[in-house]
Amino acid sequence: MGAKREEVLTEKEKTRTAYHEAGHTLAAWNLEGANPVHKVTIIPRGRALGVTQMVPDEDRMNMSEQEIIDHLVVLLSGRAAETLIYDELTVGAENDLERATSMARRMVTHWGMSKELGPVSYKMSDEDPFLGGQIHKLSLIHI
């Protein structure tokens, strides 16, 4: 969870963080492919204002596409909860967005889980660090 930070959150920040973490928690409780919730806190730790810790029931070496999608939903549910309650976005979901983007990108570029592009692995090179550039080049070849 990271080291506890000493700064004190305002009541407004605590409430917003609680809604954010509740979003993660509710999604994890309701999605079959999500890992079970182990611990939830709104005590700031590391870079996070709050943490919802999920721990798998067993060690696993493989995940189904639906389990990955459920994991993506859980990652994005904190931001969704904030948006539903406050009708505005904050920077608090930065790590969630980074992790969701990385996982979604791997679904397409490494695991062939794109219905549109098909079962192909697109290895990213240093010359084309952005997914769109690499796939755009491949699309032009097919045209």
Predicted regions and their residues:
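Hydrophobic alpha-helical transmembrane segments of multi-pass inner membrane proteins, especially
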Residues: 1-3
